[in-house]
Amino acid sequence: MHEWALADGIVRTALDYAQREGAKKLLAIQVVLGELQDVNAEIVEFAMKELLKGTIGEGAEIEFIEEEAVFKCRDCGHEWKLKEVKGSFDERIKEDIHFIPEVVHAFLACPKCGSRDFEVVQGRGVYISGIKIEKEGEA
């Protein structure tokens, strides 16, 4: 269900942009999926295609880019990637992080110094990184 809500927000944003720009056709949407969010791209794509039916975006190309999750310790400066520690997560933890990425601080610590004071440098959230439209008179 979470993926459908994300798809709805992406589609509405893309269609609003296309309308503001006077587009006759929405050709493509490029979406970045942060690894930390652990979103199922297949479900999002299916939902987006369904939501685009009957609109100027029907048949639009949908591209996903996965952005790797990277963390940086505020105490020692060490940087590490989610994939380096993800194996220690059980399904409950993965689900918690999926719905509320901020809880990652409760489950992770810097692998170098053990601090839980770290920032998410990249790989959090879902956002549109590109929209391609066709305006009147363009081919």
From Swiss-Prot:
Pfam families: HypA
Statement: the UniProt record of this protein carries the keyword Zinc: yes
Example of a GO MF term: nickel cation binding
Protein name in UniProt: Hydrogenase maturation factor HypA
Keywords, in A-Z order: Metal-binding, Nickel, Zinc
Domain of life the protein comes from: Archaea
Entries under InterPro entries matching the protein: Hydgase_Ni_incorp_HypA/HybF_CS, HypA/HybF
Taxonomic classification: Archaea, Methanobacteriati, Methanobacteriota, Thermococci, Thermococcales
Positions that bind Ni(2+): H2
GO biological process terms held by the UniProt record: protein maturation; protein modification process
